[in-house]
């Protein structure tokens, strides 16, 4: 078997055209980056879920809200890692509630205190959700674009294969097989990059949506508690 008929994976890549090699290199880089985001997002969501469950347990244990607020402030200042999303929301709402309350001791406006706390919690919620949803758009882009990039490499490789037939007197399968094989590698790697990215995007989007519902529910429940306390 000649070198041009060697259909091993490495041989096909090394003998591919420069453009096809660039496509393969691009897809490999995109795939490695997406896998990095997949694992980092998996750990981030797992951590966010554990922190949420722990804070909910502490919040609904019947303890004093001011003590829980002081604990949240202490955790933010002393923790080597970022505090949980729900704890951030609680701290933001309680902080704003206390500021408005202390600034209007003479004439307490329950509506103003509640509105300020709710706006602060919403702002904290949006900031935290932006962090949780970071890199999801990249995974979505990889899942939708990678197959087309691979298809581009495939089309280019097949064009080169048929262009090479112009220099031979008799067209045989052996003459075009290496070129077609190298072209199909681009499609395979494109799918290899796209499929995990799509699966991860769908899974993580669902997990984050479930967390978002818990955060929004907490905002409403905590707002009701503050409303009762401000009467």
Predicted regions and their residues:
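Internal alpha-helical transmembrane segments of multi-pass membrane proteins, especially GPCRs
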Residues: 14, 18, 24, 134-137, ...
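Alpha-helical transmembrane segments
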Residues: 28-48, 151, 158, 193-208
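Gly/Ser/Thr-rich beta-alpha loop segments that engage phosphate groups in nucleotides
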Residues: 145, 152-155, 159, 181, ...
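Hydrophobic alpha-helical transmembrane segments of polytopic membrane proteins
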Residues: 183-197
């Amino acid at each position: 078997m000649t070198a041009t008929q060697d259909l091993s994976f490495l041989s096909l890549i090394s003998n591919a055209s420069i453009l096809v090699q660039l496509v393969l290199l691009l897809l490999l880089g995109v795939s490695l980056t997406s896998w990095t985001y997949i694992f980092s997002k998996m750990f981030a969501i797992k951590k966010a879920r554990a922190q949420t469950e722990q804070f909910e347990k502490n919040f609904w244990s019947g303890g004093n809200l001011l003590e829980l607020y002081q604990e949240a402030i202490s955790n933010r200042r002393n923790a080597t890692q970022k505090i949980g999303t729900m704890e951030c929301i609680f701290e933001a709402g309680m902080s704003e509630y206390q500021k408005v309350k202390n600034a209007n001791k003479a004439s307490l406006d329950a509506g103003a205190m509640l509105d300020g706390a709710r706006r602060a919690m919403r702002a904290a919620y949006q900031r935290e959700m932006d962090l949780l949803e970071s890199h999801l758009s990249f995974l979505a882009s990889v899942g939708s674009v990678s197959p087309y990039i691979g298809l581009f490499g495939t089309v280019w490789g097949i064009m080169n294969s048929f262009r090479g037939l112009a220099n031979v007197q008799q067209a045989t399968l052996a003459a075009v097989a290496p070129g077609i094989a190298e072209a199909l590698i681009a499609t395979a790697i494109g799918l290899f990059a796209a499929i995990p990215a799509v699966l991860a995007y769908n899974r993580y989007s669902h997990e984050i949506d479930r967390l978002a519902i818990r955060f929004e529910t907490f905002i409403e429940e905590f707002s009701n508690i503050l409303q009762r306390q401000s009467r």
